[in-house]
Amino acid sequence: MDSSMSTKKKTKLSVRNQTCFKKSSLSSSSTAKKTTNLSMREQTMFKKALELSTLCNIDVCVIYYGRDGKLIKTWPEDQSKVRDMAERFSRLHERERCKKRTNLSLFLRKKILDDTKLSEKVLEMEDSLESGLRVLQDKLLLLQPEKNQTEFGQTRAVSSTTNPLSPPPSLIEDHRHQQWTEPLMSGVSNTEQDLSTSSLSQNQSRISVFLYNHDNRSFYQVPDSVSSFDQSALLGEQGSGLGSNFDLPPMVFPPQMQTQTPLVPFDQFAAWNQAPSFADPMMFPYN
């Protein structure tokens, strides 16, 4: 048991020693890396100062202090030049110091402000362009009817010059209107004529013809078969065959008269069935 316990203690001690050695080795390696990184940064900073003074043709100095506040290194290596530049900078006014001083936070803030100003300018320009576009669109809408009128006038002028014998559009429209109205008027006149002829035929079918005898002053009624033919032919034959002793009364066509009273007074005792030798035709309406 004692031997086993001693072996365990030895192993624990060896493990602790190994871990401590590892920690020391790690710390030494980290410090070595830090020193190398710092030395590389110093070289880079001094190199950038040299490039800046050469390219911009300005006075640049670098003063490098340690953690304890001791001066470690300067650039340029001549400390008199560095002291002269530091004194000149300290004698400047606060405004001049701000102009010649560059801070990262101030630089970023200035960049952000410049970006916002640029965006504001872009927005203002966009608004002005949109307003100008609206004005142009309104003017275009106002000029569109005038453009259509001018194009219509030009087309009319071109058509008149190409075909001088063609009538103007106004005459063509009047002719078309007349072509539409003439059939309507002719149709109306034809219907009126048909109505007049039909009414005349109806009236003729309701008219009786009477012959007047001057000798015995009596009337004689012509049969219906005789009254149905053309009365103008009958009157023409009577006018050519009769002498001047027989007077032809005027033809009377009363429209649809509902009376049987004769138009000319006659003797009520005259012989109606006896045909006279000479007679004048008289017409009376009947139902």
UniProtKB/Swiss-Prot annotation:
Cell compartment(s), UniProt: Nucleus
Keywords: DNA-binding, Nucleus, Transcription, Transcription regulation
UniProt main location, coarse: nucleus
Cellular component terms per the entry's GO annotation: nucleus; plasma membrane
Pfam families attached to this UniProt entry: SRF-TF (PF00319)
GO BP annotation list: positive regulation of transcription by RNA polymerase II
Quaternary structure and partners: Interacts with MEE14/CBP1.
Protein name as annotated: Agamous-like MADS-box protein AGL53
Annotated gene: AGL53
